[in-house]
Amino acid sequence: MNFLLAGIGASIGAMLRYAITNYGKKHWEWIGNKFSNLPTPTLFINLTGAFILGFIFGIKTNVFIYAIVGTGVLGGYTTFSTMNTELVELYKSKNYRGFIFYALSSYLGGLILVFVGYYLAILF
């Protein structure tokens, strides 16, 4: 049952990521250009996913919610491989400032937001 829930959740997460990525490419390009050509949609997706995952862990819900939201939706929503591919592209284009900023904001920002989500959930 959890296997099926995770699969359904992953489909939902992937569709959300697709929609947000396309929306972000049209409407958030100015943000990325202002900050060394950062891939803003991927950064937004991964940081919000980290926050939500921390929150889900913090509310101590049942295993079905973990399967559908934590593993499924957020597994399909967030993207580690795209982020790293974008980091390589920033490096190859000699955009070292963008590379460092994107790496730090993705890895460190994601870790911080997991903790923020977790501790906010504990308050509720």
Curated annotation (Swiss-Prot):
Q: How does it sit in the membrane?
A: Multi-pass membrane protein
Which keywords describe this protein according to UniProt? Answer: Cell membrane, Ion channel, Ion transport, Membrane, Metal-binding, Sodium, Transmembrane, Transmembrane helix, Transport
What catalytic reaction does the record list?
fluoride(in) = fluoride(out)
Give the record's GO CC terms.
plasma membrane
According to its UniProt record, what is one Pfam family this protein matches?
CRCB
Where does this one sit in the cell?
Answer: Cell membrane
Q: Its Gene Ontology biological processes?
A: cellular detoxification of fluoride
Q: Say yes or no: keyword Membrane present.
A: yes
The family line of this record is: Belongs to the fluoride channel Fluc/FEX (TC 1.A.43) family.
**How would you summarize the oligomeric state and partners of this protein?**
Heterodimer composed of FluC1 and FluC2. Neither FluC1 nor FluC2 alone catalyzes fluoride efflux from liposomes.
| Identification of the protein by name | Fluoride-specific ion channel FluC 2
- The scientific name of the source species is Lactobacillus acidophilus (strain ATCC 700396 / NCK56 / N2 / NCFM)
